Amino acid sequence: MLVWLAEYLVKFYSGFNVFSYLTFRAIVSLLTALFISLWMGPHLIAWLQKLQIGQVVRNDGPESHFSKRGTPTMGGLMILFSITISVLMWAYPSNPYVWCVLFILIGYGIVGFIDDYRKVVRKNTKGLIARWKYFWQSIIALAAAFTMYSIGKDTSATELVVPFFKDIMPQLGLLYVLLAYFVIVGTSNAVNLTDGLDGLAIMPTVFVAAGFALVAWATGNVNFAAYLHIPYLRHAGELVIVCTAIVGAGLGFLWFNTYPAQVFMGDVGSLALGGALGTIAVLLRQEFLLVIMGGVFVVETLSVILQVGSFKLRGQRIFRMAPIHHHYELKGWPEPRVIVRFWIISLMLVLIGLATLKVR
């Protein structure tokens, strides 16, 4: 909203014109979200401790996790607040893509908050019943998917971008809604599954968001979009502001979530961040790129699916424990080693994903 104010003030002082530059707004969006997180963190942690809102730890998990019992959770509130304020300050409020992401971010944040509340306040270890969680995730995702389809149904915004093939961009039509639904819900739950160690989920989220910031900038630039053979989408540029806000809020949260964590994000953070990343990927027409850049989330999810499937079909487990990060813990890897190695893999996958944009 400050952009509109700056457009008015530029009549009195030309220096306010700097607010019209996307790169400037992207930087201040990141810094705004970062500083809000850093400021809010100690206050939120103290408040959560006062209310005794602490993490519930599984009895069948690694023994090293027992010391985490009681650590404040629902820290994702600071992430959501930081992102929302930063985006509202620095993005153009008239941009429909921005509102689609905020709708998912806040909607999934509410679902996650209810789940966390039932777990840590009501002492219900199951939290929100799975079918109700999935129901509300589905309703919110479908509402966003139909909205996004109505915005771009007559443009290249509903084409499917296939990696490595510059001339293959099939028009999805209404299948766009179905794809958007699965990507948003799937990514939300994938990030949620990954959030099992201190800082494990937030840093890959930051890497992927940073990667999508570059993609959004290119997609919203007619010349770079043509150069990379990706669809030019005139609303996409403002998603840079959203992505950099996620990066800033994520780094601010990591300040308190790094090993040993002072606070956990909880479902209020992981479901919302995953949903936001999925929505950004759909809006940019880069669902396949999300699979590559978010490979850590994909592998974590597949490990759970394979573990459950193998146990039901063969009565045997593939991993010592799923998601797969617990498998490595039980093999004797110290928690920081698991975390940092997953970070390195995530960074490599983001770079590989960005490289595929040119390898066509």
UniProtKB/Swiss-Prot annotation:
This is Phospho-N-acetylmuramoyl-pentapeptide-transferase. It is an enzyme of class 2 (transferase). Its EC number is 2.7.8.13. Catalyzes the initial step of the lipid cycle reactions in the biosynthesis of the cell wall peptidoglycan: transfers peptidoglycan precursor phospho-MurNAc-pentapeptide from UDP-MurNAc-pentapeptide onto the lipid carrier undecaprenyl phosphate, yielding undecaprenyl-pyrophosphoryl-MurNAc-pentapeptide, known as lipid I. HAMAP family: MraY (MF_00038). Its cofactor is Mg(2+). GO terms for biological process: cell division; cell wall macromolecule biosynthetic process; cell wall organization; peptidoglycan biosynthetic process; regulation of cell shape. Pathway: Cell wall biogenesis; peptidoglycan biosynthesis. CDD domains: GT_MraY. It catalyses: UDP-N-acetyl-alpha-D-muramoyl-L-alanyl-gamma-D-glutamyl-meso-2,6-diaminopimeloyl-D-alanyl-D-alanine + di-trans,octa-cis-undecaprenyl phosphate = di-trans,octa-cis-undecaprenyl diphospho-N-acetyl-alpha-D-muramoyl-L-alanyl-D-glutamyl-meso-2,6-diaminopimeloyl-D-alanyl-D-alanine + UMP. It comes from the Bacteria. GO terms for cellular component: plasma membrane. The gene is mraY. Keywords: Cell cycle, Cell division, Cell inner membrane, Cell membrane, Cell shape, Cell wall biogenesis/degradation, Magnesium, Membrane, Metal-binding, Peptidoglycan synthesis, Transferase, Transmembrane, Transmembrane helix. It comes from Yersinia pestis. InterPro entries: Glycosyl_transferase_4 (IPR000715), PNAcMuramoyl-5peptid_Trfase (IPR003524), PNAcMuramoyl-5peptid_Trfase_CS (IPR018480). GO terms for molecular function: metal ion binding; phospho-N-acetylmuramoyl-pentapeptide-transferase activity; UDP-N-acetylmuramoyl-L-alanyl-D-glutamyl-meso-2,6-diaminopimelyl-D-alanyl-D-alanine:undecaprenyl-phosphate transferase activity. Pfam families: Glycos_transf_4 (PF00953), MraY_sig1 (PF10555). It is a multi-pass membrane protein.
